[in-house]
């Protein structure tokens, strides 16, 4: 039993939420610069799971995002197991295909995206790891003396 219900899977629900978010609306609401930046962070964060899913399937995420946005409001998306290229992708009814996500999982993903955006906006500085330069490994040594026949 899934207590909170289900939504279209394949990260289409998150992409649909992102697609419905309009910077114009928040600007009209006279939001502060920080609020607009936070809004854009959340919007981008909501697109990322779909992008990763498509990239992991070896497909072009840029093309499929545009196609998915056109059909996501109708509960349609793509079964990545059945498409071989973004050009040939045909939208399917996600619920009929059995591609679903529990609402709780989607809700928590949205809450986490908002939490990260809030943390970034309220932090004076962010600390990250500096990528280490890896020195080339030593080449293999020569054969010791007396080993030639």
Where are these regions (language model features)?
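Extended, low-charge hydrophobic alpha-helical regions
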Residues: 1-149
